[in-house]
Every structure is written in structure tokens, then in C-alpha cells.
Design a protein with these regions (language model features):
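Secretory targeting and sorting signals
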Residues: 2-29
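Acidic/His-enriched low-complexity segments
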Residues: 24-294, 421-423, 463, 467
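Second-shell loop/turn segments in exported
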Residues: 128-131, 186, 266-275, 325, ...
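Catalytic zinc-binding patch centered on the HExxH motif and its immediate surroundings
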Residues: 163, 273, 290, 294-295, ...
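Non-catalytic accessory/interaction domains
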Residues: 175, 203, 208, 251, ...
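Zinc-dependent metallopeptidase catalytic helix centered on the HExxH motif
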Residues: 192, 317-380
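Acidic/His/Gly-enriched intrinsically disordered linker/tail segments
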Residues: 233, 354-423, 433, 439, ...
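Short, solvent-exposed turn/loop segments enriched in Gly/Ser/Thr/Pro and often Arg
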Residues: 295-313, 356-362, 378, 382-384
Length: 484
């Protein structure tokens, strides 16, 4: 995501949620029975939340999701959706009950492995009690049918909410970082549980649907609607999942190394947007050279017909507002930033939100790497020295209120540059590629980065990272031959 400070809402205390979840065995109303009685099961309930230091109530324990199959029906004349999500997961222990994250939408039914399951709603959780316990290491499939009007989460510092957003013309888009996926499909809404996806979206025949991954088909039916099918075959964090619907012009081009580039532009600004985004292929080629092979089959941009004042690196389909279309390519840094996130954030995703600098620091530094590559007049070292004049607090543990603060981006990029100066270019660019290879399609932490950088360089780097990530004031940039 491009720089945009965000403030989150406090939520229900974990202990109250856990107590309520254990007590409920009913339908969509709290405390009401579903009519099936109380299922006799052994095992233990999955944890309520994954224990993320910033968002302890988000995500759920007891299982690991392998695949989401999301089906939606939408008519722009109405704000509501009809959905069905299949969730294939593996139990991490003998599981008697588990939770899914879902906001506002009405649950119509829940099945586990084809059998009707009891369920209840406890605030923004769906608590599922299968007919019999699910053994440890067993793979099981939960199917949730749901409907209603998606409600985005409030965000005081953004013109739009988090999650599902609907514009006045009926078009929709998704901007979910960090916890908005639960506004439109039931999920384990935490980046530590990545999964593959497929989407089947039914809309009127005159609408286009953009989503993650590979476009499989967009077949018309006899009722005047079209079903758009997309597949995301590489694991993806929930906050990067996106389905957007509206009237768009689709621009397709062949990118480097066989990557398909597919952009979705509003018709009235499509020509201008095409010019502004025309260098995506060049950026893709350069980043592939320095970061390693592009980790997905396709890439593109979705430009929505409203101002967003931020952008988001939805996996394979980055999101931009129309305010990033100007006709003079002034948004090139943001375009480079979101593309770089496909490696740093999408391919390799932080295990916990406190390590957000791993996303934003590297993506911001990638902007400077692009200009250093593309513009002979650009002075990278002078630019980085100039940035050290800014007052930027610690970023190793920024707190949820400063998750997307300027410090995370700029001090993060300075940390990356300090690392480069310390270990030298050969080790640094080896690190960029190895990071994306070793942790491909998975999660990593700051500790993982330090360990890998030390292994490659042969240097002890804990002191360097402590100073740049955690000290109240960061030190001067090292010189290339100064060690730390």
C-alpha cells in the first residue's frame, strides 16, 4: 500500500468472545439454537484469533486454510450480494469447533464435509460446530452460504472504508489491508494463513469483473448475465484477495518472460490511464532482473472511478484510484511501488503485522531503485541522505495506529539502504533474490531477514537493525566501507 496513516477500531475483548463462542450452538442469532440440538463432539475448539500483537482477535486457530472457492452474484442496481464460499482446510489438532471471520453479512447455512453443521454469530465471528470432531491433520471442507449488503469497516483517514466498497454507479472494489476481507467472504482473515483461491462471479452481461490471478473464462448464460471465473494458484493472504465489478475497458499486453499484463480502466479516462501505466512492462523486466522471477502468471492495474489517495497491491491486480491518472506519469513512483509489492508483501508476506516494514520499506526502496536505473540524473545516495533529515520514529514495532505511517515507508527504505551499504551490492542483490526464493508464497519475519543477511554477508547485523528499526533516532547512513 502507498503511504496512508490509518487508525483502527477497538473490538470485543478476546475473553468475552471466547466465552460466548463456547456457550453458543445455534443459528445466526446470538444464543439461539439452530434446531439441530447440541452436537456431541470431542476435541478442543480452535482459538479465537491467532494472537497477532496488533489484532489479536483477527484470524482463528485450530486449522490452516489451503483453498478458498468464492462464488458471488451481484447486480449493480442493488447493494446486496449472494455468496457461497468453500473453505478447504487442515485441522491443526482434534477440532470440536472453529471460527470464521465475517462482518455484517447474513449466514444462510453452513456445512462441513457435506453435513449440516451448527453455527452461531458472535460479533464478527461465525462459530462452527461440526457434527463430529475433525481429527488432527485431517483435511475438511466448510461451505458457507450467505447474503446481504457488505459493510466496509470505518477508517477515519480514508475516503473509503476497508474491505468491500460500492460506488454510486453500482461498481464495486475491494481495499482490505489489514483486515477487510471479512467484509465480503468468510475467512481466516490474517496474513499468516495464506491459501489458493478461485472466484466465480455472476454479474449482468455489460459488466466486467477484475480479480486475482488468471482469467479462466467469462461466459454468458441465457439469463443475460455472465460468469467470470478467475484462479489464483499461488498462495495469497486474505487482505490481498479482491473482486471488483463495473464498466471497464480491458487493456491486454504481453509482458516480459511470458507474463500477461491486463489492466482495467474506466472508459472515460482509459486512454490517459493507458499512457500513465504504459511502462509497467519495463518495470516488470527490471524488477525481475534484481528481485528474481516474477512470482505469478499475470499482473495488471485496476483503476476505479473515484479518488482513493492510496493504492493497494492486491495480488496480481493492484488497485488505484482515478486520482493516480494524470496524463503526465507523475504516478510512476506509486506504480513501481505496488508492482514491487508483488515480491515484497505478496510473494513473501509478514508473519505478523508488526513486521509491516518488510513490505513497505522494500517497496519504497524499489521506487528509488527504479529511478536510479531509469534516470541517469537521479542520485540515489544523495536522495537517501536527504531523507535522513526527516523526523521518523522507530518502525520495528510501530503499533497499529502507525502501521502505514510515513516512518514505516521512509525509515523502512533507509533501513534497506543502510543494509545495502553495509553488506555491499553483491551480497545485497543476492539477498533480494534469495529472500523471494526461500520464502516464496509463504511468510517471514524480521528475524528471518537478519539471519539470511548475516548468512550471505558473513557479518553480524543485529546492531545495525536495532539501530535502524528500534532506536528513537536512527544513526547516520554507513559508508560502503564502514561496516555498521
Amino acid at each position: 500500500m502507498t503511504n496512508s496513516t490509518r487508525v483502527r477500531r477497538s473490538v470485543v475483548a478476546l475473553i468475552a468472545l471466547a466465552t460466548a463462542a463456547a456457550a453458543c450452538g445455534g443459528s445466526g442469532e446470538e444464543g439461539e439454537d439452530s434446531g439441530g440440538g447440541t452436537a456431541a463432539v470431542s476435541g478442543e475448539p480452535g482459538a479465537v484469533g491467532v494472537g497477532d500483537p496488533y489484532y489479536p482477535e483477527i484470524g482463528n486457530g485450530g486449522y490452516d486454510v489451503e483453498h478458498y472457492s468464492v462464488s458471488l452474484s451481484y447486480d449493480p442496481a442493488r447493494p446486496d450480494i449472494v455468496g457461497e464460499t468453500g473453505i478447504t482446510a487442515t485441522a491443526s489438532h482434534d477440532l470440536s469447533q472453529f471460527n470464521l471471520d465475517l462482518v455484517a453479512l447474513v449466514v444462510d447455512s453452513v456445512e462441513v464435509d457435506g453435513e449440516v453443521a451448527e453455527w452461531s454469530r458472535v460479533d464478527d465471528e461465525v462459530v462452527v460446530t461440526p457434527d463430529s470432531s475433525i481429527g488432527a491433520d485431517r483435511t475438511f471442507k466448510t461451505v458457507v452460504e450467505y447474503s446481504g449488503t457488505p459493510t466496509p469497516l470505518e477508517d477515519d483517514l480514508s475516503p473509503v472504508g476497508l474491505g468491500w466498497n460500492r460506488l454510486e454507479d453500482g461498481s464495486t472494489f475491494v481495499l482490505s489491508e489489514p483486515d477487510g476481507a471479512r467484509t465480503w467472504f468468510p475467512s481466516n482473515d490474517h496474513p499468516s494463513d495464506k491459501a489458493t483461491y478461485d472466484f466465480a462471479v455472476t454479474v449482468p452481461g455489460d459488466l466486467e469483473v477484475a480479480a486475482n490471478g488468471r482469467l479462466e473464462s467469462n461466459d454468458s448464460d441465457t439469463e443475460g448475465t455472465r460468469i467470470w471465473r478467475w484462479s489464483m494458484d499461488e498462495p495469497m493472504a486474505t487482505y490481498l484477495a479482491a473482486v471488483s465489478m463495473g464498466g471497464y475497458e480491458i487493456e491486454e499486453a504481453a509482458g516480459p518472460a511470458g507474463v500477461e499484463i491486463r489492466n482495467f480502466f474506466p472508459p472515460d479516462i482509459a486512454e490517459t490511464a493507458s499512457y500513465d501505466f504504459a511502462r509497467t512492462g519495463e518495470m516488470l523486466a527490471y524488477f525481475t532482473e534484481i528481485f528474481g522471477a516474477y512470482p505469478f502468471e499475470e499482473y495488471g492495474a485496476l483503476v476505479v472511478p473515484t479518488a482513493l489517495f492510496s493504492a493497494l497491491e492486491n495480488q496480481t491486480m493492484s488497485l488505484f484510484g482515478e486520482d493516480f491518472v494524470s496524463g503526465d506519469r507523475t504516478s510512476e513512483p506509486v506504480i513501481a511501488h505496488e508492482l514491487a509489492h508483488q515480491w515484497f508483501g505478496d510473494n513473501v508476506t509478514p508473519e505478523v503485522w508488526s513486521d509491516i516494514w518488510l513490505n513497505e520499506g522494500f517497496a519504497t526502496y524499489a521506487e528509488f531503485l527504479w529511478f536510479d536505473h531509469d534516470d541517469p540524473a537521479f542520485d540515489l545516495d544523495a536522495t537517501m541522505v536527504g531523507l535522513t533529515s526527516l523526523e521518523l520514529g522507530p518502525i520495528g514495532d510501530p503499533g497499529p495506529d502507525d502501521l502505514f505511517s510515513q516512518a514505516v515507508y521512509i525509515r523502512g527504505a533507509l533501513t534497506v539502504h543502510a543494509l545495502r551499504l553495509t553488506i555491499g551490492d553483491e551480497a545485497f542483490f543476492d539477498l533480494l533474490k534469495r529472500w523471494n526464493d526461500v520464502y516464496a508464497y509463504s511468510n517471514a519475519t524480521t528475524a528471518d531477514l537478519i539471519e539470511m543477511a548475516e548468512e550471505i554477508s558473513g557479518l553480524e547485523l543485529a546492531e545495525l537493525f536495532d539501530a535502524w528499526l528500534d532506536a528513537p533516532e536512527f544513526p547516520p547512513l554507513p559508508t560502503p566501507d564502514s561496516g555498521t
